[in-house]
Amino acid sequence: MLAYTYIEHGKFQLLEKPRPKIKDTRDAIVRVTLGSICTSDLHIKHGSVLRAVPGVTVGHEMVGVVEEVGSGVVSVRPGDRVTVNVETFCGECFFCRHGYVNNCTDSNGGWALGCRIDGGQAEYIRVPYADQGLNRIPDTVSDEQALFVGDVLATGFWAARISEISEEDTVLIIGAGPTGICTLLCTMLKKPRRIIVCEKSSERIQFVREHYPDVLL
């Protein structure tokens, strides 16, 4: 299969690689149907992610169809359309049990996909801890609609959630890129008194003005 691969600092390359196989009873193999590029992928390319392993397939924002599951997987089955969580996590360590899955102590835990183990800029991906890392997509939701759930939208949701926003608050969001817009959308659900977005790109400013006229820039 074709896989977009981190070769070395400043270099990615499309390579031919073997299709992934089940390694653990809790794994699933997913056929990728749609993916996107995260800024973190660019951070890897530019050498800002020291844990990134040369030779790894990059990518951690994707949706797909389950092709195969390990014997211990119970929440999904072959044929299911699924989102893939950016964080793989065991669900059992101290951090997982307290909700901080990004700090999972398992060797395949935390931000592993597309950084320390092969990610989703490929035709297929192996997802460890599939019961925690995969979520079925309803038939009424398209791949395009579900794509951001696993990372960029979840990042915006988490930011809005931990900020404990009230209806009396003024909220400042720095940046109106994809993550900033997702954060804006999730912040709007909290109905604060005022939302301010700080952005220097004229194109992004125009986008916010066009789609979110009540937001201050």
Language-model segments: which ranges?
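Cysteine-cluster motifs in flexible loop/terminal segments that predominantly coordinate metals
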Residues: 38, 75, 86-135, 139
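Mid-domain Rossmann-like dinucleotide-binding core that forms the NAD(H)/NADP(H) cofactor-binding site
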Residues: 136-217
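Extracellular beta-rich ligand/substrate-recognition surface
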Residues: 5-12
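Glycine-rich beta-strand-centered segment in the early N-terminal region that forms part
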Residues: 20-35, 48-97, 138-141
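Cytochrome P450 core scaffold surrounding the K-helix E-X-X-R motif
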Residues: 40-46
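Residues that mark the start of a beta-strand
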Residues: 2, 27-29, 170, 194
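Short Gly/Pro-enriched turn/cap motifs at secondary-structure boundaries
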Residues: 7, 19-20, 53-59, 113-118, ...
